[in-house]
Amino acid sequence: MEDRALLAVSTFCFLLGFAYTMFVLGSGRYRPSRFNFAAMIGGFVFQTGFLVERGHALNACPLTNLFEVLIFLSWSMVLLYFLVGTAYRISLLGVFTSPLAFIFQTVALISPIDSPPGPRARVAPQPWLETHAAISIVAYGAFALACVAGVMYLIQERQLKTHRLRGMFFYLPPIADLAVAINRLIFTGFILLTLGLLTGFAVRPEVEWSKVIWGVGVWLIYGGILQADKWRRVTPRRVAVLSVAAFSITLATLWGLNFLAPKGSL
């Protein structure tokens, strides 16, 4: 199966799981179900298959263009979902994670941002450089999941304030647990991004200032959120809002890198 076909199947799995859950929610008879979790597993398996096929064709980690970066980001987010979901009610975190994975992959599939590897596309491996890039994108995956948890927090807080407790509310994690999850995910992403930046400086003799500026900018944003939370300068609600806003800015950096960095150097 061609790598893009694997990606299309993965994207359909995420859409199927999300659509099923939305249908059940709309019927007013929501109950925790393994269907969405199974769809997430299917999507992840085909995501992994795509990355393996593309990596084999390139003889390198598949992070050579914005198309591959978006898929790797989606994969990282889903992987982290499986790692932390058991602590924060798998079914509901997956409901909010699957549409974001679907959006990332749909944008990648329909946008003219891919250059499929040809028979001469294989390049000399650069393990440390690939490690630097992969760590940085996994950090973005942690920020994406923090954004998802932030949305869940804001939905639950609104329902509590308006006293309109709908079916989904009773299956959301306690709001205090969501606040802790957001903080820990941001902290995890911050540490990974720090490692990514440090390894980037270590493995590249020349400095690409466009990447440095964007990367350090994201690092400062999330570092500021963590520091403000540590000093009790912001409420948990504000941290949730900032996690959503910060990830929106982070997504813009991916496009910024695509336009500002030298072609093919992602």
What are these regions (language model features)?
Residues 156-178:
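Membrane-interface interhelical connector segments
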Residues 138-163:
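Transmembrane alpha-helix/helix-exit interface in multi-pass inner-membrane proteins
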Residues 224, 228-249:
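Interfacial loop-to-transmembrane junctions
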Residues 1-17, 135-143, 264:
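Hydrophobic transmembrane alpha-helical segments in integral membrane proteins
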Residues 89-132:
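Hydrophobic alpha-helical segments and helix pairs
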Residues 47-100, 112-113, 198-216:
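Membrane-interface helix-loop-helix modules in multi-pass inner-membrane proteins
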